[in-house]
Amino acid sequence: MFVPRGFSYAGVHCRIKRKRKDLGIIFSEVPCTAAGVFTTNVVKAAPVIYDMEILGKNPSGIRAITVNSGVANACTGEQGMINARRMAEKTAKELNIPVESVLVSSTGVIGVQLPMEKVESGIEEAVKNLSKDPVPFAEAIMTTDTKIKIHSKKVTIEGKEITVLGIAKGSGMIHPNMATMLSFITTDANVSEDALKKLLKISVDDSYNMIDVDGDTSTNDMVIILANGLAGNAPIQEETDGFWKLYEAVHEVNQVLAEKIVEDGEGATKVIEVEVRNAPDRNSARLIARAIVSSNLVKTAIYGEDANWGRVIAAAGYSGAQFDPDRLDLFFESAAGRIKVAENGQGVDFDEDTAKKILSEKKVKIILDMKQGKELARAWGCDLTEKYVEINGRYRT
């Protein structure tokens, strides 16, 4: 694991949750250029509203992010906004930095007020425990996650070594367009505000916005990137070679984290990748891939190892994309092999036992060849199991 210069991390148990860590802080020695992408849900949690306001005013002066898990601080009215601000104010006081340099985030049960005495005590403890180890922070932001999600990447730009580190949480309520997931990316790159915003948006569109666990979109989701410039490179501007090199590093981090979220889907036993090939345009390819990976009927078919290919074609049909259904070829693929199940929009004879063997693997790929263009899109998801119902039926207990 590589850690970018100038960043430190902490995670503590402040008793919002009964046992596990539940409050984390990321801190930069110097002000950072920052950018964020937030939930598309009309119902936005207090921390989302607060952070959007702060980033609008101070996108080049962020020093810290404080995150709690266990309580979402969503649907909490004016008191929720007061509590979000109190989180920032307490963090600023303990770190001796301006309050407008602090972002906040929450994840957990909706409609419950934050226990602010516990939160403020946790902030004090977390500041004392800041270190170069990001693992405690990764543990502190988990809710129904079963494992931490961290990935890092090094890249050399104009002779300067730059590090990108991402930490995410998410396993349920994951649906295309940012849903119940938090991701915090830190880098020591020196990058302009406009370039940072652009590369984050492009990357999120092809990573977190192309995954699905259960079709729900959360009130709290956000991806935040902080760049403190301590790598010492010349400021990276839009559309330069340096921009695309940094983008590739950031996108690898986001893509790996997105796949880790899918792999940790609540109750999941299989990861599903959908690849739409030779589509008439990129938007159609994305719409179709997302519709297929989000289909509960497709998810349950994969769980049951049932090559029910009609569900895939049906999902493509209601995606909103316009295409000729009589030209579609469909394949299932895994480490056990590959099988064609439809050609030119109609079923073909195939061996059911072979298909079941292919679908029995932990990673299954659905390939839809549209034969109507050259565009490609991929989306990722997981199967839907009885365990998912069990986990979410007992979420508050």
Swiss-Prot record:
One GO MF term attached to the UniProt entry: L-glutamate N-acetyltransferase activity
Temperature-related behavior of activity: Optimum temperature is 90 degrees Celsius (OATase activity).
Notes on activation and inhibition: Competitively inhibited by L-ornithine.
Coiled-coil residue spans: none
Site entry: Cleavage: 179-180
One GO term (biological process): L-arginine biosynthetic process
Active site residues per record: 180 (nucleophile)
Principal localisation: cytoplasm
InterPro entries: Arg_biosynth_ArgJ, ArgJ-like_dom_sf, ArgJ_beta_C
Protein's cellular compartments: Cytoplasm
Subunit structure: Heterotetramer of two alpha and two beta chains.
Biological function: Catalyzes two activities which are involved in the cyclic version of arginine biosynthesis: the synthesis of N-acetylglutamate from glutamate and acetyl-CoA as the acetyl donor, and of ornithine by transacetylation between N(2)-acetylornithine and glutamate.
Name this protein carries in UniProt: Arginine biosynthesis bifunctional protein ArgJ
Species for this entry: Thermotoga neapolitana (strain ATCC 49049 / DSM 4359 / NBRC 107923 / NS-E)
